[in-house]
Amino acid sequence: MKKIIGSLKDYLRNELKPGFLFSILIFMVAYVFIEYRYKCTNWLDLKYHDTITDTIIQYLIFLFPFTVGYLLYSSFYNDWGLWHKPLFWFLLLFAPLVFSLRSFINYFSNEIYSLLPTGRTAFFYYRCTAVVVRDLVIVIPVFFYWWIMDKNKMPFYGFTLKNYDTKPYLVMLGIMIPIVVLASYQGDFLHQYPKGFNLDPLSIDNPKDQKYFFIYELFYGFDFIFIEYFFRGFLLLAFFRHFGWGCLLPMACFYVSIHFGKPLGETISSFFGGTILGILAIRTGSVAGGIIVHLGVAWLMEFTALLHKIL
């Protein structure tokens, strides 16, 4: 825990200007308030898209806070030079595009169904396949960027155990346990979770079906590995090499926007959790600890929600 606190103190004292943090918080409070007060994205399903227009809108939802974060950084640190760099513009536009295309698999759902086994397990196979394809959509373009730009400079954006220590992350995960348990009593939480137990017509109450639910939970967790890799790996380690600590809070703003539609508490906490994990990822050069925390919290949310459903 001392390492976590020490890293946070060092960032707050030496890297962060209070005005920058305050402006980011004001912007994100307004952005989240407008979304949850007026339900601006209710008509847009952030997971399943039927038109190119929906994907473009999702891209803009991600791009907007990411761009504002960098604009605020430039304003408070008087660093407008990065806006004259073609590489910055490429990364600024490229990153939200890659993440918004995760849902591209849904354009081909009928084709995928035709290739998978039929019967009661069809939806199970589809959801597992969708997880793999969504993650490949992230990994492949970012891997090509790393191969061209950073292969000789760093491991694959945080996929390393060098400088990694498990203990601080286990402490963080332990702190999250009572928070998740308390959240699990909220109606909006139980409306969202457990996500892994919607495999109609399979039923968790049927002993013959139960194995499919737990297999899917493994795939569900696989998804979080690559979300962590994208946000704390690519968006920080690739950007930090060129733009320094200014990349941290714009990443957190972007990260909040992917939580729209989820319980409000989860969306708010994503900013602070993403920032803390981001500081540690930059300090260690590894996303391994972030994966432990993110995956552990995700499965904990599934498990606590399941207990409420079956008890």
Where are these regions (language model features)?
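Aromatic-anchored segments of alpha-helical transmembrane domains
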Residues: 26-37, 95-105, 176-186, 252-260, ...
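Juxtamembrane helix-loop-helix connectors linking adjacent transmembrane helices
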Residues: 100-137, 143-223, 311
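Functionally important transmembrane alpha-helices
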Residues: 248-311
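Interfacial transmembrane-helix boundary/kink motif in multi-pass membrane proteins
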Residues: 5-24, 49-56, 77-98, 118-131, ...
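Hydrophobic alpha-helical transmembrane segments
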Residues: 21, 60, 89-93, 168-174, ...
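Transmembrane alpha-helical segments in integral membrane proteins
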Residues: 67-75, 138-152, 222-241
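Alpha-helical transmembrane segments in multi-pass membrane proteins
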Residues: 36-70, 79-147
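Membrane-interface helix/loop boundary segments of multi-pass membrane proteins
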Residues: 158-170, 226-250, 279-286
